[in-house]
Amino acid sequence: MPGAMQPLQDWPASERAGIVGVLTDIDDTLTTEGAITRDALQALEALAGAGLHVIPITGRPVGWSEAFALQWPVDAIVAENGAVALTRDAQGRLRKLYQQDAAERATNFARMQQVAQRVVREVPGATISRDSGGRETDIAIDHSEFTHLPQDAVDRVVAVMRSEGMNATVSSIHVNGWYGSHDKLAGARWAVRTLLARDLDAELERWAYVGDSTNDVLMFQHFPHSIGVANIRRFEQQLAFKPRYVTEGERGEGFVQVAQAILAARHSRAGGNPRH
């Protein structure tokens, strides 16, 4: 939303009670200092136990996301900014679904490695993210995970990627670039349709999105129930669209507060099937 962010407690209980699914960023939204806390994991379990759908959507790579897709109580993880969905089959084995076919992925992969090398050559201090070995459909430049790039260097990385015809977004830790029409919103629509047989746009009022950075702006713009964890304020002046609500807690603590707000409203509502 373009206006000021409202405190989470201003989210009407009647709206919270109707939520059937939560889409969330991972780094610095669900996790804290690079790991999921016990409280955040319990919040995921509580949401799932109440019958809500939960789908984390991240710029992190497939390789990084695989273990969490198997371990966390979520419907799926959508990795690499909407390109790949990781879920479990009936036997609990990892299943990967792609938006692009194998030939297109191979062609794009080769092009992206060339762009990554150009970024490293042309932007002082730029380094390829340490998790890049697990990436299949994008590239990532570290700006805040294991190194620090000043804002002008981050802007230059984005400019180089876009000059090569790539999409480029900035998360709380990386600059991600990729070829293709997918993004977090397209990935959310695709995953909900493919895995849950639901039309996300037809029931937007029943879904919430939680995020923390400029990489979430498209989701903040699209979802009426959008929430930023408190550390979103780091990026507040750069947000073309702000989340409607903001938590008091940062990172995983903020996510826990969102889960508690939804569950409290649902528990106070008499009867009803959450997956109608």
Residue ranges and their predicted role:
Residues W72-P73, N81, E164, H222-F223, ...:
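Short, structured coil segments at secondary-structure junctions
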